[in-house]
Amino acid sequence: MSNIRPLHDRVVIRRVEEETKTAGGILLPGSAAEKPAQGEVIAVGNGQITENGVRALDVKAGDKVLFGTYAGTTVKVNGEEFLIMKESDILAVLEG
C-alpha cells in the first residue's frame, strides 16, 4: 500500500476488477465494460467533524464495499490507481 492518508470522512478504495467477459462468453471491449462499483477499503480518515465532535467512520481498512459507478475521484499513487470518496458515497459493506 502506498503512503496515502485520507482526511476527515474520506476513504481510499482499490477497485475490484470486473470480468471483461459476459456470462455467455462474449468478450467486452474496454469501453463497453463498466467500471466496477465494488472495491476494498485501503485507508480511512479520522472521521466526520460535527458540532458534537468527531464521528468515527463505519467502514475500516479491509472492508469490501459497494459504491456508485461514478462515485469518488480517481487518483494514481506510485503507479497504482485508487478512488478517494466520502464515506456517504459508499452504499453498502459486503459481509461474509
Curated annotation (Swiss-Prot):
InterPro entries: Chaperonin_GroES, Chaperonin_GroES_sf, Chaprnonin_Cpn10_CS, GroES-like_sf. It comes from the Bacteria. It is found in: Cytoplasm. GO terms for molecular function: ATP binding; metal ion binding; protein folding chaperone; protein-folding chaperone binding; unfolded protein binding. Keywords: Chaperone, Cytoplasm. Gene3D superfamilies: GroES chaperonin (2.30.33.40). SUPFAM superfamilies: GroES-like. One of its GO terms (biological process) is chaperone cofactor-dependent protein refolding. Its main location: cytoplasm. It holds the Pfam family Cpn10. GO terms for cellular component: cytoplasm. NCBIfam families: PRK00364.1-2, PRK00364.2-2, PRK00364.2-4, PRK00364.2-5. Belongs to the GroES chaperonin family. Together with the chaperonin GroEL, plays an essential role in assisting protein folding. The GroEL-GroES system forms a nano-cage that allows encapsulation of the non-native substrate proteins and provides a physical environment optimized to promote and accelerate protein folding. GroES binds to the apical surface of the GroEL ring, thereby capping the opening of the GroEL channel. Heptamer of 7 subunits arranged in a ring. Interacts with the chaperonin GroEL. This is Co-chaperonin GroES. The lineage of its organism: Bacteria, Pseudomonadati, Pseudomonadota, Gammaproteobacteria, Moraxellales. The gene is groES.
